[in-house]
Design a protein with these regions (language model features):
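Short beta-strand-to-loop transition segments that serve as allosteric relay/switch motifs
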Residues: 63-68, 108, 132-142, 148
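Flexible loop/coil segments at beta-strand boundaries within sensory signal-transduction domains
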Residues: 111, 123-129, 138-139
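Helix-loop-beta substructure at the N-terminus of cytosolic sensory domains
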Residues: 11, 24-61
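Amphipathic coiled-coil signal-transmission "stalk" helices
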Residues: 7, 11, 25, 161, ...
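A short, aliphatic-rich beta-strand micro-motif
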Residues: 79, 116-124, 133
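GAF sensory/regulatory domain recognition
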Residues: 48-88
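Allosteric cytosolic regulatory segments
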Residues: 149, 153-160
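Signal-transducing coupling segments at domain and membrane junctions
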Residues: 95-117
């Protein structure tokens, strides 16, 4: 695969490919599928979950989930609030440090465990967070490095814009159908 270089991905090439594909997609299902597949393949992670705000509610998408589009556990609100404050990728350990109460830390750790993820990257919105990309451990067992986090943050920013555009386009199509 041309996105890998000696067992690792080519950061610039992957970013160029994902950016190009995101700029041409107007279908939310296609965007979700492309993001999940590209990130899972390039970073060789065990799991990729997208959490996206749709019609006022967060929804889960990814491989290995029971149903696509189901609502996440209630503890997701804790994590969203942390991401709104931090505005950057955050691990389960770092997220727990942001919480004062032991009960909240345990609930958050339980959420990460239930989802099978160890890193979350916010999808920024005009106001707050429109969702997140949640990643499981790398298959190699390696930790995420700064280059990974920079890449994921850039992808998340572009993905948030593409998702917002697709949602606006779908709303416009629905309005035109109803006329």
């Amino acid at each position: 695969d041309h996105l890998f270089f000696r067992g690792r991905y080519d950061y610039r090439e992957l970013l160029r490919e994902i950016s190009g594909r995101l700029s041409t997609l107007l279908s939310l299902p296609q965007i979700k599928e492309m993001l999940i597949g590209s990130i899972a393949g390039a970073l060789q992670v065990e799991k990729v979950i997208l959490v996206i705000m749709e019609k006022g509610r967060f929804r889960l998408y990814g491989e290995g989930l029971g149903r696509q589009g189901e609502e996440p556990p209630g503890e997701i609100g804790l994590l969203i609030r942390i991401l709104e404050r931090e505005k950057r990728p955050i691990t389960v350990a770092a997220a727990a440090k942001r919480l004062a109460g032991r009960e909240d830390r345990e609930r958050l750790a339980g959420l990460f465990k239930q989802l099978g993820v160890m890193l979350v990257i916010p999808l920024p919105a005009r106001e707050g967070v429109a969702g997140m990309i949640a990643l499981g451990q790398k298959r190699s067992g390696e930790l995420f490095v700064d280059e990974d986090l920079e890449l994921l943050s850039t992808i998340a920013n572009q993905a948030a814009t593409a998702i917002e555009n697709a949602q606006s386009y779908e709303a416009l199509e629905a309005l035109n159908r109803d006329l």
